[in-house]
C-alpha cells in the first residue's frame, strides 16, 4: 500500500512547532539570576552552621542523691537545726549537641519551630569554642565557682560562719553555673529548713534555675523554656526563674507549672514561705 508523501506545507508547519521558542530578555535575566541563587540555597542547606540543637535535660534533686551520694552534705556544730523536707528542690538542665557537632540548615529550621526543641547559637552554649576538653574544663570551673558562691550566699543568709557549718557539694555529670540558686536553697533547707521544724518546699516539687553571687543576687541563665519543660516532666508544680527571664519562660510555659520570679536568695525564700503559708506569691 502506498502512502502519500507529506506536503511541503505540512513539513514547514511541523518544523515551526518543533523550533524552540526564544526567551525574552526578561526571562533570560531571571534565569541567569536564579541559577546562582539555587546554588547558594543548595550550599546553605548542606553547609555546617554555628548552632547547637538543644532539648530538655535532666533534673536533679539537690536534697537527694547523685549516683548514690548526697548532693549536699552539711556538718559542724551549727548544722543540726533542720527538720526533714519531704518535697524536692530540682535544679534543671538542657541537653545540647556536643561542641563541634555538624548542624545543618534543615535541622535548624525544624528545631526552630518546635516547642520541645531549640536551635541555639553555639557561642551561647559553648562560649569557649568547639574543643570538647576546653568546654568541659570551662563548665567544671564555672560549677566550682558557682558552688563556692552558693555556700557563701547561704551562710550569709543564715548568718553563720564556715566554722559553724561545713558544706560539701557534689553533683555528677553537670557543669556550668546555673544551679547556684538551688545549691543555696538546698544548703539552707538542710541546715535550718523553714526555721519552724519543717522544710522549705512545704512538700512540693519546686524546680528552677539561676546563677548566684556571694551577696545573694540571682542572675539569668540560658535555655529557660526547655528547663521549664524538664521541670514539668519530672513532677514540678512551681518554677523559680530569674526575673529577667520571665518573658522567655512564659513563651512556652507548660500547663500547670507556676512561674515565680526571683532576684535574690532572700526573695526566693520569701516566695517559698508564701507558698507554704498561702500568702501572696509573685508571678511572671
Residue positions per predicted region:
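Peripheral, non-AAA+ core regions of ATP-driven protein-machinery
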Residues: 2-284
Amino acid at each position: 500500500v502506498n502512502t502519500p508523501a507529506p506536503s511541503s506545507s505540512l513539513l514547514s508547519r511541523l518544523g515551526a512547532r518543533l523550533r524552540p521558542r526564544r526567551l525574552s530578555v526578561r526571562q533570560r535575566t531571571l534565569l541567569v539570576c536564579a541559577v546562582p541563587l539555587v546554588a547558594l540555597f543548595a550550599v546553605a542547606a548542606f553547609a555546617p552552621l554555628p548552632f547547637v540543637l538543644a532539648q530538655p535535660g535532666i533534673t536533679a534533686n539537690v536534697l537527694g542523691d547523685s549516683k548514690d551520694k548526697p548532693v549536699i552534705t552539711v556538718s559542724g556544730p551549727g548544722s543540726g537545726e533542720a527538720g526533714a523536707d519531704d518535697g524536692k528542690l530540682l535544679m534543671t538542665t538542657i541537653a545540647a549537641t556536643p561542641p563541634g557537632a555538624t548542624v545543618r540548615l534543615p535541622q535548624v529550621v525544624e528545631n526552630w519551630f518546635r516547642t520541645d526543641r531549640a536551635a541555639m547559637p553555639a557561642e551561647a552554649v559553648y562560649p569557649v569554642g568547639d574543643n570538647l576538653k576546653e568546654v568541659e574544663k570551662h563548665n567544671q570551673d564555672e560549677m566550682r565557682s558557682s558552688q563556692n558562691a552558693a555556700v557563701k550566699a547561704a551562710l550569709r543568709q543564715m548568718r553563720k560562719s564556715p566554722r559553724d557549718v561545713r558544706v560539701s557539694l557534689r553533683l555528677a555529670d553537670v557543669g556550668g553555673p546555673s544551679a547556684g540558686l538551688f545549691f543555696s536553697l538546698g544548703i539552707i533547707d538542710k541546715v535550718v529548713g523553714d526555721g519552724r521544724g519543717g522544710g522549705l518546699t512545704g512538700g512540693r516539687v519546686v524546680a528552677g534555675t539561676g546563677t548566684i553571687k556571694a551577696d545573694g543576687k540571682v542572675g539569668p541563665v540560658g535555655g529557660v523554656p526547655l528547663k521549664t519543660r524538664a521541670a514539668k516532666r519530672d513532677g514540678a508544680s512551681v518554677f523559680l526563674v530569674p526575673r529577667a527571664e520571665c518573658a522567655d519562660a512564659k513563651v512556652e510555659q507548660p500547663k500547670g507549672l507556676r512561674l515565680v520570679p526571683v532576684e535574690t536568695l532572700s526573695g526566693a525564700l520569701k516566695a517559698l514561705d508564701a507558698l507554704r503559708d498561702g500568702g501572696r506569691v509573685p508571678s511572671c
